[in-house]
């Protein structure tokens, strides 16, 4: 089913809306937990939903390698395979291919690489990505693109962006040929170069997509460059389509993305950091394995309503972490996922109440940090 995007309110550049799918409605701005292999690590779908998650991200590349398209089709699709009946967005595999480094070769046709699981030679292109994502039953399908690395010269970024545009057209054509009833998002590339981002936006909007992602950021560039590119790119994207910042990020990155007009985010950070004992709280980050928490009987965050904070102390979580108990990783993950969803809920409420700038100021004040200036404020 084609999603319906309703833009309900704006507060500066911050946007408040909703994505309406057959499988449910997603309030935006929204954060999507990452379920790489068809699971948010260590969590049942019910637990993920209880944290406030409305939509998940699945990984086309990894699910293609394991368990494969045939096993997926035996179950119906990814929703049935993992028992998550809400909306799912799948990335196209482009970023994972980018991450393979020396074991892949990119050509105009697609990408030749060795299967990191068993070493077999395999090939992925725009058409194959569209076919896999249709079999996954993705509510939002991402085009196959090349993630421009950082650093890249202007010429390198230009060639990469232009190839991604050609792949975008192939993705659109094959998506339509497959008669996929769901939704296809384009991905803006161009590295840190504003003129290349302009060309990418123009090319993608001429092809036409159901939503637009900003890709190729959070790959090593300075934060100032990410903010500058977002601030330049977002106003050029169609007002009536959702905007998705891929692979981002820290809580501060989500706030800065919303300040610049982003509606959707995803990142492994809350789950990965949870497993490493880095826990997000109102004032910043707690490293739970530090000795200072051994005798601290207070919860992680007095403002948090998650299962972990309602039932366990920092001392207990420290103990579980030091003993490498699986429960520790699970409780940490529940907390971090809930923190991210509470952050998005607070952002949505602030936009609804026309006080988003005040929210941003308070968010940074709790971290003893200055609010990063917008480009227009620097002029």
UniProtKB/Swiss-Prot annotation:
It comes from the Bacteria. Substrate binds at residues 91-95, 145, 189, 216. Keywords: Glycosyltransferase, Metal-binding, Queuosine biosynthesis, Transferase, tRNA processing, Zinc. Binds 1 zinc ion per subunit. Coiled coil: none annotated. Pfam families: TGT. The keyword tRNA processing applies. Its EC number is 2.4.2.29. It is an enzyme of class 2 (transferase). One of its GO terms (biological process) is queuosine biosynthetic process. One of its GO terms (molecular function) is tRNA-guanosine(34) queuine transglycosylase activity. InterPro entries: ArchSynthase1/Queuine_TRR, TGT, TGT-like_sf, tRNA_ribo_trans-like. Zn(2+) binds at residues 304, 306, 309, 335. Its cofactor is Zn(2+). The active site is at residues 91, 266. Pathway: tRNA modification; tRNA-queuosine biosynthesis. One of its GO terms (cellular component) is cytosol. Residues 247-253, 271-275 are annotated as: RNA binding. Homodimer. Within each dimer, one monomer is responsible for RNA recognition and catalysis, while the other monomer binds to the replacement base PreQ1. Catalyzes the base-exchange of a guanine (G) residue with the queuine precursor 7-aminomethyl-7-deazaguanine (PreQ1) at position 34 (anticodon wobble position) in tRNAs with GU(N) anticodons (tRNA-Asp, -Asn, -His and -Tyr). Catalysis occurs through a double-displacement mechanism. The nucleophile active site attacks the C1' of nucleotide 34 to detach the guanine base from the RNA, forming a covalent enzyme-RNA intermediate. The proton acceptor active site deprotonates the incoming PreQ1, allowing a nucleophilic attack on the C1' of the ribose to form the product. PANTHER family: QUEUINE TRNA-RIBOSYLTRANSFERASE. Belongs to the queuine tRNA-ribosyltransferase family. This is Queuine tRNA-ribosyltransferase. It comes from Vibrio cholerae serotype O1 (strain ATCC 39541 / Classical Ogawa 395 / O395). The lineage of its organism: Bacteria, Pseudomonadati, Pseudomonadota, Gammaproteobacteria, Vibrionales.
């Amino acid at each position: 089913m084609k999603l319906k995007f309703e833009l309900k309110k704006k507060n500066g550049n911050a946007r408040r809306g909703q994505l309406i799918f057959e499988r449910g409605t997603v309030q935006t701005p929204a954060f999507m937990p990452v379920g790489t292999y068809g699971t948010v690590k260590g969590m049942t779908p019910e637990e993920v939903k209880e944290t406030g998650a409305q939509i998940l991200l699945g990984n086309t590349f990894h699910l293609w390698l394991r368990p494969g398209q045939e096993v997926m089709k035996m179950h119906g699709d990814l929703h049935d395979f993992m028992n998550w009946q809400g909306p799912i967005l799948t990335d196209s595999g482009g970023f994972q291919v980018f991450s393979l480094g020396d074991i892949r070769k990119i050509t105009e046709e697609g990408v030749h690489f060795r299967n990191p699981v068993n070493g077999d030679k395999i090939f992925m292109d725009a058409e194959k990505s569209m076919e896999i994502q249709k079999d996954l039953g993705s509510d939002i399908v991402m085009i196959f693109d090349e993630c421009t690395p950082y650093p890249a010269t202007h010429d390198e970024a230009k060639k990469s962006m232009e190839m991604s545009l050609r792949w975008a057209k192939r993705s659109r054509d094959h998506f339509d040929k497959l008669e996929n009833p769901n939704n296809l998002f384009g991905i803006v590339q161009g590295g840190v170069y504003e003129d290349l981002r302009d060309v990418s936006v123009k090319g993608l909007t001429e092809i036409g997509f159901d939503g637009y992602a900003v890709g190729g950021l959070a790959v090593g560039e300075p934060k100032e460059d990410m903010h500058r590119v977002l601030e330049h790119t977002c106003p050029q994207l169609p007002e009536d389509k959702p905007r998705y910042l891929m692979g981002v990020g820290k809580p501060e990155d989500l706030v800065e993305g919303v300040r610049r007009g982003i509606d959707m985010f995803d990142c492994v950070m809350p789950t990965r950091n949870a497993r490493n004992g880095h826990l997000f709280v109102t004032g910043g980050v707690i490293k739970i394995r530090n000795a200072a928490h051994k005798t601290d009987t207070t919860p992680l965050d007095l403002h948090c309503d998650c299962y972990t904070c309602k039932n366990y102390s920092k001392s207990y979580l420290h103990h579980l972490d030091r003993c490498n108990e699986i429960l520790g990783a699970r409780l940490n993950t529940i907390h971090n996922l809930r923190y991210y969803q509470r952050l998005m809920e607070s952002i949505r409420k602030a936009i609804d109440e026309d006080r988003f700038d005040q929210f941003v100021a308070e968010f940074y004040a709790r971290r003893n940090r200055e609010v990063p200036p917008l480009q227009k404020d620097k002029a």
